[in-house]
Amino acid sequence: MLRDLKQTDNVGGFDVRPGNFLLNGATTVSGGVNFTIHSVYAVECTLLLFRPYAKIPYARLRFPDSYKIGNTYSMLVFGLDEVDFEYAYSF
């Protein structure tokens, strides 16, 4: 279960692990937020985190290559609360 998962890596100062590829978009889970995105042509993907209404991201988390299956990237970022950030992706 997602609530029993532990971090396996640190990306951009955040504890992370491969996400649940079946949860599309940003999904709050116990302990953090799962981010999953599908892109046919992307060769890499970076998660951008913003403070609410900010124009410049406060964090950039590049998805490790091992967090990609086919054309889908998924990463669980621990310690995030959905009310504290906005997000985007960079390809």
Name each model-derived stretch.
Residues 8, 16-20, 26-27, 40-83:
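Aromatic-rich carbohydrate-binding modules that target alpha-glucans
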Residues 31-35:
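Structural beta-strand segments of beta-rich domains
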Residues 37, 83-91:
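Short beta-strand segments enriched for Tyr within beta-sheet-rich domains
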Residues 1-9:
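A eukaryote-biased signal for short, well-structured alpha-helical docking elements
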